[in-house]
Design a protein with these regions (language model features):
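P-loop NTP-binding core
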Residues: 1-263
Length: 263
């Protein structure tokens, strides 16, 4: 989950997409790669009480299994972040294969999960480069407000470089419109502009602006546990369905088999 522009809904999407995928009985791991650790707290993890985080895995070579914590949702685990991650990029400069540290770490547990979601900070630093090097694909949240496309060109250039130098398999999973309000002309203009630029790469699902969705992180809960009937909950369930169906079609196409969509 990446976009160098802050406040576009990366963390909110990570938390609630993960919970929604788990609702469809998928095993999911959230990796919180943002020093603010909002994805960790939004999933109910008290970072003051943990012994091992992403930082210890990267810098101290801690066993990744020791950094995996369960959540209140069955099938959903998290590797939490820590404020110490702020200085990790400097500490990583002397590491061998420093761009592949997170990939090598996640390769140890990749087969334990159907989906691994990495919440990146709003920067294109070494931690984000690590996340993109480890990823199969990138979801790019785009806020339905002024300057929505600001910074996306730079992100796309970074993805292009990583694809050519570090991770040839890296793809764009899709652009996700967030904080959408159909009553606002601007929101509809942004939607049309993003659709015109990126066409089939834009998710059909949009995430509407929603009070319950904004409130749920302060309670340490995904919105599906905070208010299952809210628009925020329904939007993320729809997004999870779209991603599951897209990926199952992709797998079945490779296997030359048939697929059955989630309804």
């Amino acid at each position: 989950m990446a976009n160098q522009k802050g406040g576009v809904g990366k963390t909110t999407t990570t938390i609630n997409l993960a919970a929604s995928l788990a609702t469809f009985e998928k095993t999911v791991l959230v990796v919180d790669a943002d020093p603010q650790a909002n994805a960790s707290s939004g999933l109910g993890v008290d970072i003051k009480e943990i012994d091992c985080s992403l930082y210890e895995c990267i810098i101290d070579h801690a066993d990744v299994h020791d950094a995996v914590y369960t959540t209140d949702i069955n099938g959903l685990d998290v590797i939490p972040s820590h404020i110490d991650l702020v200085g990790a990029e400097i500490e990583m400069l002397n590491l061998k294969n420093r761009e592949r540290v997170i990939k090598n770490m996640l390769d140890q547990i990749r087969d334990d999960y159907d989906y691994i979601l990495v919440d990146c900070s709003p920067s294109l630093g070494l931690i984000t480069v690590n996340a993109l090097t480890a990823a199969d694909s990138v979801i790019i949240p785009v806020q339905c407000e002024y300057f929505a496309l600001e910074g996306i060109t730079k992100l796309l250039n970074t993805i292009k470089i990583i694809k050519s130098k570090l991770n040839p398999a890296l793809e764009i999973e899709g652009f996700l419109l967030t904080m959408y309000d159909s009553r606002l002309r601007l929101a509809n203009q942004i939607y049309d502009e993003v659709k015109r630029h990126f066409q089939e790469l834009v998710f059909k699902t949009v995430i509407q602006r929603n009070v319950k969705l904004s409130e749920s992180p302060s309670h340490g809960l995904p919105v599906i546990l905070y208010d299952a009937d809210s628009a925020g909950s329904k939007n993320h369930l729809a997004l999870a369905k779209e991603i599951i169906n897209k990926n199952e079609k992709r797998v079945n196409k490779q296997d030359d088999g048939s697929t059955q969509e989630i309804q």
